[in-house]
Amino acid sequence: PRRAHSIAAQGGINAAKNYKSDGDSVMRLFYDTIKGGDFRSREDNVYRLAEISKNIIDQCVAQGVPFAREYGGLLDNRSFGGVQVSRTFYARGQTGQQLLLGAYSALSRQMEKKKVVFYPRHDMLDVVLVEGKAKGIVTRNLVDGKVETHSADIVILATGGYSNVYYLSTNAMASNVTANWRAHRKGALFANPSFT
């Protein structure tokens, strides 16, 4: 997980916390996001994201993400990316890296408690379907080459972006569409491929 391309993200995360008392709100964040997406985004998804944006920042702080702070100790934010108010929470010039490390730290704590089993150096080969529902995956152990199956009640593919499906991309070479394609081949729905 520490090799994800998210490590390159620098800007920050927009959230309607209204720390600067400049009139920010869920509706204002919603409108800025829709407008910034050239009115092509799904409005119900954007509205839901605007609603939970405050909680996302709080969750990241709880995971240990060191967001920039003002001298008084409150989280600092700035105007970034054409928004109308200061709502971008950031970790200096390395927001993506700090978010990734925070998420990985939270995952590590769950692994220590034996609540999560981690399979490093495994490549997903296929999705296992039972009565039309994803109930596991087939993987190849990249160390010894053995093929293994892993059953689950729910399958979540957290594969990251797939920008290398295009000819030109600044993303790492591992950011390809392979896992998405394998799931789509088994019947998973696929939408908005241009928004990677």
List where the protein language model places each region.
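Well-ordered beta-strand positions in beta-sheet-rich domains
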Residues: 147-151
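Conserved N-terminal/central alpha/beta ligand/cofactor-binding core
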Residues: 2-135, 139-141, 146, 164-165, ...
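Short, well-ordered coil/turn residues that connect adjacent beta-strands
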Residues: 120, 153-154
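Glycine-rich loop(s) and the adjacent beta-strand/alpha-helix scaffold that form part
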Residues: 154-196
